[in-house]
């Protein structure tokens, strides 16, 4: 089992404190009327003046700032922002009032539940000391939040508001339970709003002109890694324009690297990918995504990443790039390259977590982990080492990408012996599928 990659434990809350949906306030509670400064303008000048006065116009989502003048069909009311300084002191507004056919006015605007943002509604619902959950991850039709202990009594209210404000884009809101500490990097979750019927957790995600189908409760997917997926895919595709390339994706998941590298997008494909994942569910969806995106030159496996490295060598498959996207423990898998028998020195791309200290310290910590697993020093110059921050994971942790050429010294090391792996699949040995 992998080490936990999150610091927090499962928040505990007394069930008796949890607010039910039946206790959610009536929407009329949020209804309010406010008087705003306004300009009474000719109908024919509406578009012109909205553009001229955009810096002082009143704005709110799903709410108009132009209304008909009920006393004169040839005129309209243009609502101005209720700012600290009188909106009528604005130079442009003064000029329009003094020299053109515009008049001072005021207008009562009704703001209802539908007009407020998620944050505005939750500020009215949650206690002052409770932090407002303002961010969430989208995975297909799912919204994924990670609520703190102080927010848990209001989890169903929070889910309802998020759902109300984001339909139909969001169909289900889930809250993460505990840490990511399973072998397959999945985590427990609970539905706090929306659809939870059959296949509620099976989603479709679009990325890099490809469509991915996956069960969010059974496989790992992080939408915040889209930029890193794009960066590495584009780097390899650009290199493949001048020569054919072979890529080994050792922890391929449902295919965020492997699928766009081999998908048919009207281009000549010069990339062959050997995609592997230990999770049988990831393997299942990888096969589906390979088929639905019409991928070519891809071989799919369901086995341990270390075994995959040894199998490629046993089959005399020369690899140009190796992708190891398992941040919690990918550097430790580099021990599989001891005694490497290939002629080429592949470029290896390892993703890992590192504590935040200083850039130099973080980078060196990642390099030390890689060197320790490889069994030799990873020299920055001779191994063409490149390190960069992929994303800010938490206040104390970054995710890094470490790319380097496999050191020649690994060839003289003793090849490690692999222990038989007990997986959740009942099928003996590795499963392999080829797509031409």
Curated annotation (Swiss-Prot):
Compartments it resides in: Mitochondrion matrix; Nucleus; Cytoplasm
Positions with a binding annotation for S-adenosyl-L-methionine: 229, 277-278, 325
GO biological process: tRNA N1-guanine methylation
Transmembrane feature ranges: none
UniProt-listed Enzyme Commission number(s): 2.1.1.228
CDD domains found in the cross-reference section: AdoMet_MTases
Keywords: Cytoplasm, Methyltransferase, Mitochondrion, Nucleus, S-adenosyl-L-methionine, Transferase, tRNA processing
EC primary class: transferase
Catalytic reaction(s) noted: guanosine(37) in tRNA + S-adenosyl-L-methionine = N(1)-methylguanosine(37) in tRNA + S-adenosyl-L-homocysteine + H(+)
GO CC annotations, alphabetized: mitochondrial matrix; nucleus
GO MF annotation: an example: tRNA (guanine(37)-N1)-methyltransferase activity
Protein family membership: Belongs to the class I-like SAM-binding methyltransferase superfamily. TRM5/TYW2 family.
Function as written in the Swiss-Prot or TrEMBL entry: Specifically methylates the N1 position of guanosine-37 in various cytoplasmic and mitochondrial tRNAs. Methylation is not dependent on the nature of the nucleoside 5' of the target nucleoside. This is the first step in the biosynthesis of wybutosine (yW), a modified base adjacent to the anticodon of tRNAs and required for accurate decoding.
HAMAP family the UniProt entry points to: TRM5
Subunit-level organization: Monomer.
Name the record gives this protein: tRNA (guanine(37)-N(1))-methyltransferase 1
